Amino acid sequence: MRSLVLLGMSSLATANSLWSSKAASWDTTNEAYTLGNGKLGVMPFGEPGAEKLNLNHDELWEGGPFEVNGYRGGNPNSSMTEILSEVRDEIWKKGTGNDSRLHGDTDGYGSFHSLANLTIAIDGIDKVSDYTRSLDLGTGIHTTTYSTGKGKYTTDVYCSYPAQVCIYKLNSTATLSKVTIYFDQLVEESSLWNATCDSDFARLRGVTQEGPPRGMTYDTIARSSIPGRCDSSTGKLAINARNSSSLTIVIGAGTDFDGTKGTAATDYTFKGEDPAEYVEKITSSALSQSESKLRTEHIEDYSGLMSAFTLDLPDTQDSTGTELSTLITNYNANKTDGDPYLEKLLFDYGRHLFISSSRANSLPPNLQGVWSPTKNAAWSGDYHANINLQMNLWGAEATGLGELTVAVFNYMEQNWMPRGAETAELLYGGAGWVTHDEMNIFGHTGSLVVNPCTSPEQGPTTFGCTHWQQLIHQVYENAIQGAEIAGETDSTLLKDIKDQLPRLDKGLHIGTWGQIKEWKLPDSYDYEKEGNEHRHLSHLVGWYPGWSLSSYFNGYNNATIQSAVNTSLISRGVGLYTNAGWEKVWRSACWARLNNTEKAHYELRLTIDQNIGQSGLSLYSGGDTPSGAFQIDANFGYLGAVLSMLVVDMPLDSTHSEDDVRTVVLGPAIPAAWAGGSVKGLRLRGGGSVDFSWDSEGLVDKASATGVSSNVRIVNVEGTVLV
């Protein structure tokens, strides 16, 4: 039974800023707040008067063809189809087999790499009071304020997509003292980088490897609105700002990576032009404009995206005036009401992270988004296809950020497809292209093969793995339905898909203890262990985030499938296997699709309790992974979990016509703790959006739709038609 929350006891909070009364330390991913424009990522930290910006560039990687001659992206030198046939024969005979002979070479795989730190040192700052730093999620601007005996200081930092630079603006109520700016690269050998300066800028150029072959070149400039004196021996620019109360610094960066040069025609080099001219141009261009113009254009761009969707939840704990680190520290998963203000704040932060790390001209966000302070990021800061990469996109389309997903499709076209065509030919003797679980930015595709298959990160190498069968089912349906929209002219391909679909094993088998089976193998092989709390829910990918089980099999309305999913989730535990945030938000979304409000909300609360750091970023808490390592997919997956509590919106399969009615359910798992909340701008499949609100029990009672097809039936969880 839902508990009653009196809305009159609290007001709806805007929940639009993260703030702290303490400066962030060098432990940036646990304490600092993030900014970005897709290409550049920034984490401001450091004490007043010695503020630093930790900088990243989305393309800066070590490894790959820049550092390894003859780099092959994990592919073999010659065809492996005979070995593949032998492995398959072994599996058909024994049920399982050894596919190690097919594994790709990981030499030169590399890692996402920190760009630099920029220090802005202000002379004479001591006896600081009234310190506050905040990130406004409505504007994407990070503001630090503090007072000294000389006056009040304010610094604003933001990363502009229109200008392709980040801006640091310093203001003081008194005239400024000397300000010194300089770069350093503390995670790399000093022989690999060089800090220089001129009268109006500080600069750092570096390379990831001296060679041969010479590694990737990177370049970053911080250009000042007030000229100064360059110390060429240190690369420090000393700015005498005593006649001014403000200073603007524009930061730009680039590399010689070129995503369009990863084809056979370019020998998969990914080698582009030296970034020097580009970096000089964008920083000069930005500084030629007024800071107010740069700010206005940034806010228009950022806020236009952020304001496309609004989630309002009640501030039942009076949390609005409490800093983020305290809210996180005091949060308890076992407190059933949670803290709706914080839960909404983290939802908004997830959208901010996506806006800041996924743009039309950038790579998609990797496992660290675009923020890593180290030389070797955890898990290389790469892309994991089994769940993590797709989790990054769970909240994009429904919350009005669909245009930003172009980054991942560009990455697939430029990075996966060219080398993946070689993988398909060498490993499978087939046409088309293929990629496997772990990818870098250099077209690495060759690790584990699809068939033979495995269930991600556990179990045997076998055939007919549930994870893959459910995905293939969904891919086939998508191809059939998308062909007309895309203007597909390959009639042979479509005929093959349509002929194969009825014969396809679709990954729905219920086991002896009532679970969705993870492998097609008979139970006598004893791989289906009840109580296996592995982090992945691979056999439920067709329940969420997919819909082969939940929609194509009508599982959302089928008691037998619902029971099997429920049994599987209970067996899998609450997500403490490695105590990662992403395993919990996935469970939350699955429970929400079962209309199980209690468990969906608990998993959300457990994520905050166990995995959200003082910065609002998701950190590992233990297990067999690096303790405290930052991994961004839980921040993005959090969006998907909350959206699953707010809506069930799934496509029909290809047997249905355009005239068939599709049902959308609003509020399948809204907790009573969110009483009186509302949503504006939730985008639905097929176009259009819906606004809705709910009562003190979490039951949606009001809704209005804009641009939604008449064939879409919108109901609440009790089946009441709303629109």
UniProtKB/Swiss-Prot annotation:
Keywords: Carbohydrate metabolism, Glycoprotein, Glycosidase, Hydrolase, Polysaccharide degradation, Secreted, Signal
GO cellular component: extracellular region
GO molecular function, one term: alpha-L-fucosidase activity
Record carries keyword Secreted: yes
Highest rank taxon of the organism: Eukaryota
Signal peptide: 1-15
Glycosylation sites: 77, 98, 117, 171, 194, 243, 334, 558, 566, 595
Alphabetical list of InterPro entries matching this protein: 6-hairpin_glycosidase_sf, 6hp_glycosidase-like_sf, AFCA-like_C, Alpha-L-fucosidase, GH95_cat, GH95_N_dom
Catalytic reaction list: an alpha-L-fucoside + H2O = L-fucose + an alcohol
EC numbers on record: 3.2.1.51
GO biological process, any: polysaccharide catabolic process
Cell compartments where the protein resides: Secreted
Recorded family membership: Belongs to the glycosyl hydrolase 95 family.
Cited function: Alpha-fucosidase involved in degradation of fucosylated xyloglucans. Hydrolyzes alpha-1,2-linked fucose.
Name of this chain's protein: Probable alpha-fucosidase A
